[in-house]
Amino acid sequence: MSTPTQLSYKDAGVDIDAGNALVDNIKTAVKRTHRPEIMGNLGGFGALCELPTKYKHPVLVSGTDGVGTKLRLAIDHKKHDTVGIDLVAMCSNDLIVSGAEPLFFLDYYATGKLDVEAATSVVKGIAEGCVQSGCALIGGETAEMPGMYEGDDYDLAGFCVGVVEKADIIDGSKVVAGDSLIALASSGPHSNGFSLIRKVLEVSEADPQLNLEGKPLIDHLLEPTKIYVKSLLKLLEQTDVHAMAHITGGGFWENIPRVLPEDCKAVVKGDSWQWPTVFNWLMENGNIAEFEMYRTFNCGVGMVVALPSEKVDAALTLLNAEGENAWLIGDIAKRNGDEEQVEIL
C-alpha cells in the first residue's frame, strides 16, 4: 500500500501566505483612515471604537451594501483601484442621509483564488473611500474559497457604522409643502443599473474604448461613485435640512419617496439640468424609455436635499464652495389622494 501524499491547505486552494502578503500590502493605506476613537490595531479578533465625546445622546446608524455587477465590468477590464471607493460610497452616502457622521467601515472580499495585486488595489480603494468619508477602516474579511468563484472573479460587501445626535436625526418628518429641492451632481452611473448597462453594451456591440467627450466609454462607466459626506456634514452644521435622498437603485421614483411624508410629493424640474453624455448614450443605444432611465439610473443626480426655500441660496453657495455641483432642482408640493410622490416636469 503506497503512502498517501501529504496535503496542505495550499493544495486545497487556500494560500495563507498570500493572505498575509495582502495584509502587509494594505497596512499603510489603512493607517491613513485612522480616527482618534479607534482603539487597537488592524488584525485583532474584534475592532474597538469609542463614541466621540461631542455627542450628548449619540445614536448609531448602520448600513451595508455592495457594488453590484459594476464589478463584472471592473474585473473584465482589470480596473480594480476604484471599486473600493464605490463600496464605501454606497454605504457612507446612505448614512449621511440620516445626518450621521461615518465612524468606521469593514469590508468583505471573497474570491476563488486570491490575486494579491488585485486585492491590494481594491483595499487601497476602500481606504481612499474611507478617507473621503472621514471614517476608519477598522477591519475586514478576505475569504479565499476555491470552487465558489470562477477564474479571477471576486465579490465585495461593505459595512459602515456612523453616529448622529439623537435630536439631529434627519428622517423626513419635517418636510412640508413649499420646501425646496437641491440636487448634487453625480460622477456617472455610480454603482447602480449595471446589469442594464452591460445589456446595452451587449446588444449595441459598442467598443468600450469608444471616445465619449474626450475619454473612453468604459472610463465613464467605471468612474467611482461620488462621496457627499464631508460637504453635507458642513451643510448640516449651517442650515436646517429637512430630508436627503441618496439616488441609487430605483432612481428618482423609488428613492425620493423614502424620505417624504405621505401628504407630500416632489416636483422635479427636468429642464433644470442636462444629463451627462453617458446617460444619453445609454438611452439611445439601449432604446430605453425615459421613465425606465429615471427608474434605473441617477441620470446625473446623486443626492437630493430638501430644505426651507429661504435657505436655498446659502446652501448652494456652501455646497459649490465645497466642490459640489449643486443646483435648485424642484420643490415639495401637497400630495392629493393617491398621486405619485415624484413628478418630473
UniProtKB/Swiss-Prot annotation:
Q: Which CDD domains match?
A: PurM
Top-rank taxon of the source lineage equals: Bacteria
**Which SUPFAM superfamilies did the record assign?**
PurM C-terminal domain-like, PurM N-terminal domain-like
Keyword Cytoplasm among UniProt keywords: yes
EC number(s) stated in the UniProt entry for this protein:
6.3.3.1
Indicate whether ATP-binding appears among the record's keywords.
yes
- Chief subcellular location equals cytoplasm
Q: What GO terms in the biological process aspect are recorded for it?
A: 'de novo' IMP biosynthetic process; adenine biosynthetic process
Which keywords describe this protein according to UniProt?
ATP-binding, Cytoplasm, Ligase, Nucleotide-binding, Purine biosynthesis
**Localization:** Cytoplasm
Q: Which Pfam families match?
A: AIRS (PF00586), AIRS_C (PF02769)
Query: Quick one: a GO cellular component term?
Result: cytosol
Look up the record and name the pathway of this protein.
Purine metabolism; IMP biosynthesis via de novo pathway; 5-amino-1-(5-phospho-D-ribosyl)imidazole from N(2)-formyl-N(1)-(5-phospho-D-ribosyl)glycinamide: step 2/2
Q: Which PANTHER family match?
A: TRIFUNCTIONAL PURINE BIOSYNTHETIC PROTEIN ADENOSINE-3 (PTHR10520:SF12), TRIFUNCTIONAL PURINE BIOSYNTHETIC PROTEIN ADENOSINE-3-RELATED (PTHR10520)
Q: Which family does it belong to?
A: Belongs to the AIR synthase family.
Q: What is this protein called?
A: Phosphoribosylformylglycinamidine cyclo-ligase
Q: What is the lineage of its organism?
A: Bacteria, Pseudomonadati, Pseudomonadota, Gammaproteobacteria, Alteromonadales
Gene field:
purM
